[in-house]
Regions:
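Long amphipathic alpha-helical segments
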Residues: 1-76
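Short Gly/Ser/Thr- and Asp/Glu-enriched loop/turn motifs at secondary-structure junctions
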Residues: 13-14, 32, 87-91, 300-303
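Glycine-rich phosphate-binding segment of PLP-dependent enzymes
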Residues: 46, 89-90, 100-126
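Conserved PLP-enzyme active-site core in the AAT-like
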Residues: 128-344
């Protein structure tokens, strides 16, 4: 297309003012507001102008009716909620990009009902004094998992960062070479340790790490032994992995707390449903783990949250750390998580 032809096309392009005065836009202005229609109109005309300069438009593209039709489509698309219902046809049951686990009906109903009114979050209803926003969910988690105490933050990455910052700042954390994981969004265990002020001390090898490797690596500077669930890969073949019970025995002998980053947070025996390799939260605690942390919106089936459970002393240290306030969730998370945990207590599927 020659410059002369391009110039002829550009002269056919209607001006913004002319389009905005068109009676065809009256309904769009009433539906979407004049400012939004004006913004989208300018953006659309700029797009058409750029295509014309590239020789990629026809005369029909420049007709006023065609432009108004496309403007209407742009406005409808703009007004559609970004977060909206979709069909998960990916083959990934708990898809991060699709909201992970759907909430149970009674959980969703509880959210709708309670969010219409003031909700108790952290006030003692008997004394009127400020209480603990954790207490409702913490009590349910104590009953479900056998933990001495529990606290809730915004997600499991936050839980990991908080416990490292609160319990291991400027000290060593022992992790198997085979568990230095990277999950979505380039979240890497070594990076989160550095951010939390802890010093990584990798033990064993990628494919074989024994209890003795941890025992020999322990020192007076060891703040914790961290067991990380490798949820998105498996090391197979010539391998050896230290069990939770063996690891807890090492921790007990060396007087070093053992923390299990469980990732998904399984509350029931999923092996009966065909999903193997997921540790139970209660089993890890009963095996001797001082703390566990896991997600609320994966296998647990609740809202996005990070749960830290176990030793009351260590949980309290996490609560007292300055990062805790920055990571604590709001009422929607507590309502949804609490109702989800009640479903488990009632033994429902």
């Amino acid at each position: 297309m020659t410059p002369t032809e391009i110039g002829a096309l550009l002269r056919k392009l209607p001006q913004v003012d002319r389009l905005m005065q068109s009676t065809a836009l009256t309904g769009l202005v009433e539906t979407h507001s004049r400012s939004l229609v004006l913004t989208e109109c300018r953006a659309l005309l700029d797009s058409i102008r750029a295509r014309a300069l590239a020789g990629d438009v026809s005369g029909e593209d420049l007709e006023e009716d065609s432009i108004i039709q496309r403007l209407s489509e742009r406005l409808d698309q703009r007004q559609m909620p970004y977060h909206r219902r979709v069909i998960n046809a990916t083959g990934i049951v708990l898809h991060t990009g699709l909201g992970r686990a759907p909430l149970a009906d009674e959980v969703a109903d509880a959210l709708v009902e309670q969010l219409r009114h003031p909700v108790r979050v952290e006030i003692d209803l008997e004394t009127g004094l400020r209480g603990s926003r954790d207490e409702g969910c913490a009590q349910l988690l104590r009953e479900l998992t056998g933990a001495e105490d529990a606290t809730i933050v915004n997600n499991n990455a936050g839980a990991t960062l908080l416990l490292l910052s609160a319990l291991a700042e400027n000290r060593e954390v022992l992790v198997s070479h085979g568990e230095l994981v990277e999950i979505g969004g380039s979240f890497r265990i070594p990076d989160i340790m550095e951010q939390g002020g802890a010093r990584l001390k990798a033990v064993g090898t990628t494919n074989r790490t024994r209890a003795n490797d941890y025992a020999e690596a322990c020192s007076e500077d060891s703040a914790m032994i961290l067991k990380v669930h490798t949820s998105n890969y498996r090391v197979v073949g010539f391998t050896e992995e230290t069990s939770i019970s063996e690891l807890c025995e090492v921790g007990k002998t060396q007087s070093v707390p053992v923390v299990h980053d469980m990732g998904s947070g399984c509350m029931v025996d999923l092996a009966q449903r065909g999903l193997r390799g997921e540790s139970w939260v209660r089993d890890s605690l009963e095996s001797g783990c001082d703390l566990v942390c896991f997600s609320g919106d994966k296998l647990l089936g609740g809202p996005q949250a990070g749960i830290i459970a176990g030793s009351a002393e260590l949980v309290q240290k996490c609560r007292k750390h300055p990062l805790y306030r920055a990571m604590r969730p709001g009422r929607m998370t507590y309502i949804a998580l609490g109702q989800t945990l009640r479903v488990y207590l009632k033994g429902e599927e």
